[in-house]
Regions:
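N-terminal Rossmann-like dinucleotide-binding module
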Residues: 1-38
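Membrane-interface segments of envelope glycosyltransferases acting on lipid-linked substrates or membrane lipids
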Residues: 1-4, 15, 57, 120-121, ...
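Donor/substrate-binding cores of folate-linked one-carbon enzymes
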Residues: 20, 84-197
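Short, surface-exposed acidic-centric catalytic microdomains
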Residues: 24-67
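Hydrophobic beta-strand scaffold residues
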Residues: 28, 49-51, 80, 102, ...
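N-terminal glycine-rich "phosphate-gripper" loop used for MgATP/nucleotide binding
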Residues: 33-34, 62, 76-92
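Short, well-structured alpha-helical segments in soluble
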Residues: 67-76
């Protein structure tokens, strides 16, 4: 399975994929970002090609940015696009060109606590259990069909930072596991239900 990974930050999730995927089954074609970041440095150190489509903050140009991102991804012809700490909303041009072929990780048990502040929102709500989700990317924000989830218990002495770090540890293991299963079994999607393989 050929994949392209999108990342925006320090790249710890990306590094977990680089370090742990079976390269005989999963080929990381490239790592892309919307900015210069440590994630790109990690990819370059691993000998993985990188590309940038710098984000355009003006609302009038976001449509063009999404077109440019879609074109950049299409140049690699990936079987799967993996959003791993990519801090931009993936727009319609990308979603339509890679329908059902983009996955994202999220630090909560969706559909609870979507958006950029999921960990803080979960703590503020007082939940006892949160977790991490891998889902198909659709045109909404963290609304796509769910592929897999893993729980993380909220401790009484947790801060947002300590909870987020434990979620990240779980997220790294989950993403690597999901990628291996997709490489072996593929993805099937029927409406809101996404499955790895024909049965899950």
């Amino acid at each position: 399975m050929k994949i392209v990974i999108l990342a925006s930050g320090t790249g710890t999730l990306l590094q977990s994929v680089i370090d742990n995927v079976d390269t005989t089954k999963i080929d990381i074609l490239a790592v892309g970002s919307d900015r210069q970041c440590e994630a790109l440095d990690r990819a370059e150190r691993a000998g993985i090609p990188t590309f940038r489509v710098d984000y355009i903050p003006r609302a009038t140009d976001r449509d063009q940015w999404n077109r440019d991102l879609a074109d950049a991804l299409a140049g690699y012809a990936p079987d799967l696009v993996v959003s791993a700490g990519f801090m931009r909303i993936i727009g319609a041009h990308v979603v339509e060109r890679f329908a059902g072929k983009i996955i994202n990780t999220h630090p909560a048990l969706l559909p609870a606590f979507p958006g950029a502040h999921a960990v803080a929102d979960a703590m503020a709500y007082g939940v006892r259990v949160t977790g991490t989700t891998v889902h198909i990317v659709d045109s909404g924000v963290d609304t796509g069909p769910i592929l897999d989830q893993r729980p993380v218990t909220v401790r009484s002495d947790d801060t947002v930072e300590t909870l987020h770090e434990r979620i990240k540890e779980t997220e790294r293991a989950l993403l690597v596991d999901v990628l291996h299963r997709i490489a072996e079994l593929g993805i099937s999607i029927e409406g809101r239900k996404a499955r790895i393989g024909s049965h899950d």
